[in-house]
UniProtKB/Swiss-Prot annotation:
E.C. no: 6.1.1.21
GO biological process entries: histidyl-tRNA aminoacylation
Quaternary structure annotation from Swiss-Prot or TrEMBL: Homodimer.
PROSITE patterns: AA_TRNA_LIGASE_II (PS50862)
Reactions it catalyzes: tRNA(His) + L-histidine + ATP = L-histidyl-tRNA(His) + AMP + diphosphate + H(+)
Alphabetized UniProt keyword annotations: Aminoacyl-tRNA synthetase, ATP-binding, Cytoplasm, Ligase, Nucleotide-binding, Protein biosynthesis
Entry protein name: Histidine--tRNA ligase
Gene: hisS
Length: 454
C-alpha cells in the first residue's frame, strides 16, 4: 500500500471555504490600497542569494530557504572544502538562489533595478507569499503571505497620515475594533540621551518593548543586566509609564526631552500625525505608546503597531518610516514609509469574531438538478440567464439519483435547488426548493431569478 502523502511542516492546504475567506481579506486590503493610489508589483518567488544574504542579520540568514543548483554542483568544490563540513560555505557553492524571506528586500532590489522607469514618490503594494526556515509552531509557519504597502522617495509626514487612514479603513471594513499604537524612533533616541545612556538605545528599547509581556520588574532587571545603572533606570520609569491623553503625553515629552534635539523632532513629527488623523475623523483608537519599539534596526521615524481590541492575539499590522532603503544595493538617499498587514492573523481574528460576510464566503447559490439529457437541455438556457444576472449557479453534470444530487447541494451549502421534470417543462416553469426552510414553489425563470437574488 502506497504511503499516505503529506506536506512539509510549517505549510498548509486551504479548503475552498478557507480560500473564500482569505480572498475576502486580500481583496478588501487590495481595494483600500487602490483607493489611496498604490500600485501593485510582483517579484519572483526566488531571488539571487547575493540579494538576500546579509540583509537580515546572522539569524535571518540562517532562516533563508536556499535552492540547490541543478547539474553537477560538486564541480569546482575541493575535497578540502567538503571535509571542512562548513555548511554556510558549502551552501554558497551549491546554491545561488533562495526563496524570498520578506517583501522589503525584493522591493528595494526592484526600485534599484527599475529606477529609470519609476515615477517618484513611488506608491507600491505587494500581496505575495514569503518563506522562512523557522521552527513551526502555533501561529508560526514556514510559508505565509505578507500584504505590504510602501511609499518611497518622499519625506512628507502626509504619507504617515495616509497609512493610519488606510489601517483604519481596512479594519473598519472588516468590522474589527483596533488600537493603532504610534511611537517615533527619534523620541526613543531622545529618551536614551536624557537618561545618559545614548549608546544603549537598542538595549533600552528592546527591554521596554517587552513591558506588556514581562512586566516592569522584569524590564528593570533586563536593563540592569545590560549594564544600565540604577540612576538611569530610575529616570526612565516615569517616562515609559507616562499616562494621559496623547496631547498630555506630548506636552510632558516636550519638557522631558527639552535638551534632546532628536527627541523634540520626534515629538514634533508625532504631534503632526496625531493631530492630523484626529482632524480627519479616524474612527479607530490611536494612541502614543512610548514602549513601542518594533523594527529598531531599520526604522528611523514613526513606528506603527495595530492590536485587535476584542481578541487576544499579537500584532495584526505594523510598519514605520525608514531611511536609505536602497543603500544596500548602492542607491543612496531613498527614504520611505510602509505598513504590512498580517493576513494569517487577520484570518484568525475574523474567524473568532465570526465577521465574514455571507456573500464573501458563499459559493454556488443555485443548483439545477439533472434528470437526463432532455431536462438538462431545458435547464441550460435558464442557467446561462441566471449567470448573466450575476447568480453563482451550476448544473449537476450527471443524471444521478436525486438523493445524491441533494446531498451534493447540502455538502456545498447551496441555498437553492431548481428541479425540472416533465410537468415543469410542459408548463415552462421550474420547482425551486429553499434548502434552508425546505419550502418548494413552482416558478417561472424570471420569478426564480427574483427569489434567488432577493
Amino acid at each position: 500500500m502506497a504511503a499516505k502523502p503529506g506536506i512539509p511542516k510549517g505549510t498548509r492546504d486551504f479548503s475552498p471555504v478557507e480560500m473564500a475567506k482569505r480572498n475576502y481579506i486580500f481583496n478588501t486590503i487590495r481595494d483600500v490600497f487602490h483607493l489611496f493610489g498604490y500600485q501593485q508589483i510582483e517579484t519572483p518567488s526566488m531571488e539571487n542569494l547575493s540579494t538576500l544574504m546579509g540583509k537580515y542579520g546572522d539569524e535571518g540568514d540562517k532562516l533563508l530557504f536556499k535552492i540547490q543548483n541543478s547539474g553537477d554542483y560538486f564541480n569546482g568544490i575541493t575535497d578540502e572544502e567538503l571535509l571542512s563540513r562548513n555548511a554556510v560555505k558549502l551552501a554558497s557553492k551549491f546554491c545561488e538562489k533562495g526563496l524570498r524571506y520578506d517583501l522589503t528586500v525584493p522591493f528595494a532590489r526592484y526600485v534599484v533595478m527599475h529606477r529609470d522607469e519609476i515615477s517618484f514618490p513611488f506608491k507600491r503594494y505587494q500581496i505575495q507569499p514569503v518563506w522562512r526556515a523557522d521552527r513551526p509552531q502555533k501561529g508560526r509557519y514556514r510559508e505565509f503571505y505578507q500584504c505590504d504597502a510602501d511609499v518611497v522617495g518622499s519625506n512628507s509626514l502626509l504619507n504617515e497620515v495616509e497609512l493610519v487612514q488606510m489601517i483604519d479603513r481596512v479594519f473598519g471594513k472588516f468590522g474589527v475594533r483596533v488600537s493603532i499604537k504610534i511611537n517615533n524612533r527619534k523620541i526613543l533616541t531622545g529618551i536614551a540621551e536624557i537618561i545618559g545612556e545614548a549608546d544603549k538605545i537598542v538595549d533600552i528599547t528592546v527591554a521596554i518593548d517587552k513591558l506588556d509581556k514581562i512586566g516592569l520588574e522584569n524590564v528593570n532587571a533586563e536593563l540592569a543586566s545590560k549594564g544600565i545603572p540604577q540612576e538611569a533606570i530610575d529616570k526612565l520609569q516615569p517616562i515609559i509609564l507616562l499616562s494621559g491623553s496623547n496631547e498630555e503625553k506630548l506636552e510632558t515629552l516636550k519638557t522631558v526631552l527639552a535638551t534632546s534635539e532628536a527627541g523634540l523632532k520626534g515629538v514634533e513629527e508625532s504631534e503632526f500625525i496625531l493631530k492630523t488623523v484626529s482632524a480627519l475623523g479616524v474612527k479607530s483608537e490611536v494612541e502614543l505608546d512610548l514602549t513601542l519599539a518594533r523594527g529598531l534596526n531599520y526604522y528611523t521615524g514613526a513606528i506603527f503597531e495595530v492590536k485587535a481590541l476584542d481578541v487576544q492575539i499579537g500584532s495584526i499590522s505594523g510598519g514605520g518610516r525608514y531611511d536609505n532603503l536602497t543603500g544596500v544595493f548602492g542607491m543612496d538617499g531613498m527614504s520611505g514609509v510602509g505598513i504590512s498587514f498580517g493576513a494569517d492573523r487577520i484570518f484568525d481574528v475574523l474567524n473568532q469574531l465570526d465577521l465574514y460576510p455571507k456573500e464573501a464566503v458563499n459559493g454556488t447559490e443555485l443548483l439545477f438538478v439533472n434528470f437526463g439529457d432532455k431536462e438538462a437541455a431545458y435547464c441550460l438556457p435558464i442557467l446561462t440567464k441566471v449567470r448573466e444576472a450575476g447568480v453563482r449557479a451550476e448544473i449537476y453534470p450527471d443524471a444521478s439519483k436525486m438523493k445524491k444530487q441533494m446531498g451534493y447541494a447540502n455538502d456545498k451549502q447551496i441555498p437553492f435547488v431548481a428541479i425540472v421534470g416533465e410537468n415543469e417543462m410542459n408548463e415552462g416553469k421550474l420547482t425551486l426548493k429553499n434548502m434552508t426552510t425546505g419550502e418548494q414553489s413552482l416558478v417561472t425563470p424570471d420569478e426564480l431569478l427574483a427569489v434567488v437574488k432577493a
